[in-house]
């Protein structure tokens, strides 16, 4: 069985069981959702804030992406959840490399408040895993594309749709992309193995 959590009833998938969670922070109580739960797949977070109005963006990202994530993981560990799958970000690695793709051995070099908050969550999750029986899986996907993609990919898609020319011919920059379907398949593998 799968139980989802959404901020708003309109975001729920028809026919899917879910609970409404107003916020993701240190105060969020996950007890009901974690009853009889074996695996948590944590995809929620604060992201894609193109015109961020927060007085302190890093603190706003930390409240949700770091503290909210660690609160959920602590409650999951205390509830007997066996695995916690966390969708982090390739931004933890940095903004760019010198001609080589990022790899698992690269030192983290987050380039934005969002990426800093994700790295801090990763560090906290590893600490929770060390002192509990919770198995933690951290996924750092590159830009994810698919129907109604948010963030930079959604913005590029919008520019193309309305006819704004993109200067891609003059850019010497390589970026990795992954289809949402492939991310979902990988998460399914992480759940089963």
Region roles according to the model:
Residues 21-66, 71, 75-79, 92-95:
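NAD(P)H-binding glycine-rich loop region in Rossmannoid oxidoreductase-like domains
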Residues 60-71, 108, 112, 116-117, ...:
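Glycine-rich NAD(P)-binding loop of the Rossmann-fold in SDR/ketoreductase-type enzymes
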Residues 111, 142-149, 170-180:
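Glycine-rich "substrate-gating" loop/helix at the edge of Rossmann-like oxidoreductase active sites
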Residues 5, 40-44, 84-90, 139-141:
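SDR active-site strand-loop-helix element
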Residues 123-147:
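Conserved beta-loop-beta element that borders a ligand/cofactor-binding pocket
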Residues 119, 145-155, 190-193:
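Glycine/proline-rich active-site loop of Rossmann-fold NAD(P)-dependent oxidoreductases
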Residues 70-113, 129, 137:
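Conserved Rossmann-fold NAD(P)-dependent oxidoreductase catalytic core, especially the SDR/UDP-sugar
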Residues 157-165, 174-193:
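Alpha-helical substrate-binding/gating segment
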């Amino acid at each position: 069985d799968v139980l989802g959590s959404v901020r708003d009833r309109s975001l729920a998938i028809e026919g899917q069981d879910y609970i409404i969670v107003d916020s993701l922070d240190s105060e969020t109580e996950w007890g009901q959702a974690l009853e009889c739960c074996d695996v948590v797949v944590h995809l929620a977070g604060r992201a894609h804030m193109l015109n961020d109005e927060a007085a302190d963006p890093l603190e706003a990202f930390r409240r949700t992406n770091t503290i909210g994530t660690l609160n959920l993981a602590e409650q999951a560990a205390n509830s007997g959840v066996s695995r916690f799958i966390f969708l982090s970000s390739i931004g933890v690695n940095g903004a760019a490399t010198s001609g080589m793709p990022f790899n698992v051995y690269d030192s983290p070099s987050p380039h934005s408040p969002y990426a800093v908050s994700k790295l801090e969550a990763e560090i906290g999750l590893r600490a929770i895993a060390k002192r509990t029986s919770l198995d933690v899986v951290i996924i750092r996907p590159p830009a994810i594309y698919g129907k109604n993609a948010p963030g930079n990919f959604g913005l590029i898609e919008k520019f193309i749709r309305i006819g704004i020319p993109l200067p891609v011919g003059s850019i010497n920059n390589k970026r990795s992309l992954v289809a949402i379907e492939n991310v979902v398949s990988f998460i399914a593998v992480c759940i089963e193995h």
